[in-house]
Structure formats: structure tokens, C-alpha cells
């Protein structure tokens, strides 16, 4: 043994007050419970079940709100097959496509408005309507007054984007040049919306 090493003190005998009395365990279980340190992640057995129940209830409420949100979103996006319910992924994809279509519609509307303001396009009210023979409706006399074009579907879904300039169901707006008709017929650009 080295002379520099300190001798270890002998442990005190049980029941004898000594210098290490703070390390002794208390005899009372209440004191023992109070003196324990809680480990991170350790769950008290009594409150664990209640905490889990509260967490589960919060999660159920969260899922319910998410499902209600998807249900509301499904009502606002157009979808082809109304016979089946869209999945959440299909609903989100449809919403993204719908928002992009609305953005294009707004951009094109702004372009038409700017063209009208700049005098590039003549408003439809300035064009004289061709006279229809007696007994025929005015829409049959003018090719631009056709109520709908074959092969150009538009969504009849509520809330679907529609142009006020579209000739699908807006009646006769006057004789437009083919370039003006194409510019004003947004339904062909939106791919079925």
C-alpha cells in the first residue's frame, strides 16, 4: 500500500449516528417517495393511465378536425366521379389543380381586362349583331352565339371556375373574331374545369 493513499473510513454501524447519516434510507415510505428523483420519461403509475387517456382524446379530436377539414375541402373542389368519395391524397391533388386553374383564370382575366383597357380588343357590345331571319332565334344566326362547343366540357360542380367571358352559357355577346373568341373562351384552356 502507498503512503499517499488515504485510508477509507469504516461504515458506521446501523442505528449509530455518524457522518454518513444523510445517505441512509428513511424508514418511512412517504419520505422515501418524496426523496426520489423523477427520471425523465418515467411515468407515475397512478397518473399514467389518465395522461394516456387525455393524449388519446386529444388525438381523436385532432383526427376528427382533420377529417372535417377534408370533408369541407371535398365539397369545394370539382371531381369527376361523384359516385365515389375521394381519398385524402386525391382531394389534396384535386385542390392543388383547382387552385392552379383559378390562378390561371385570374391571370387570363387580368390580361383580357388590360387588353380591353388598352384598346387591343373591342368590347362585344360594339359589334353589331347579325339579323336573324324571322322565326329563328338570334343564337342560331351567329356562330359565336352557340351555347356550347362540342368536346369542350366544363364542370357543372358548384364553385368550379368559370369565366364571365366564356361563350359556354353566356348567350350571344356579339360577333367576335376567331382570335378574340379563343382568347375569351377560358374553358378550353382550363382542361375541363
Swiss-Prot record:
Q: Which GO terms describe its biological process?
A: chorionic trophoblast cell development; in utero embryonic development; negative regulation of T-helper 1 cell differentiation; negative regulation of T-helper 17 cell differentiation; negative regulation of T-helper 2 cell differentiation; neuron differentiation; placenta development; positive regulation of T cell migration
Main subcellular location: nucleus
Query: What PROSITE patterns is this protein classified in?
Result: BHLH
GO annotation, cellular component aspect: cytoplasm; RNA polymerase II transcription regulator complex
Q: Which residues form the bHLH domain?
A: 50-102
Pfam families xrefs: HLH
Spell out the SUPFAM superfamilies in the cross-references: HLH, helix-loop-helix DNA-binding domain
Q: Which UniProt keywords apply?
A: Developmental protein, Differentiation, DNA-binding, Neurogenesis, Nucleus
The UniProt entry, under InterPro entries, shows:
bHLH_dom, HLH_DNA-bd_sf, MASH1/Ascl1a-like
Expression tissues = Expressed in placenta.
Q: Its Gene Ontology molecular function terms?
A: bHLH transcription factor binding; DNA-binding transcription activator activity, RNA polymerase II-specific; DNA-binding transcription factor activity, RNA polymerase II-specific; DNA-binding transcription repressor activity, RNA polymerase II-specific; E-box binding; protein dimerization activity; RNA polymerase II transcription regulatory region sequence-specific DNA binding
Subcellular locations according to the entry:
Nucleus
Q: What does this protein do?
A: Transcription factor. Binds to E-box motifs 5'-CANNTG-3' in the regulatory elements of target genes, probably as a heterodimer with another basic helix-loop-helix (bHLH) protein such as the transcription factor TCF3. May bind both open and closed chromatin, acting as a pioneer transcription factor to allow other factors to bind and activate lineage-specific genes. Required during post-implantation development for the generation of some differentiated trophoblast cell types.
Q: How does it assemble?
A: Efficient DNA binding requires dimerization with another basic helix-loop-helix (bHLH) protein. Forms heterodimers with bHLH transcription factor TCF3. May not heterodimerise with bHLH protein HAND1.
Supply the name of the protein.
Achaete-scute homolog 2
Source species: Bos taurus
Q: What is the lineage of its organism?
A: Eukaryota, Metazoa, Chordata, Craniata, Vertebrata
Gene coding for it = ASCL2
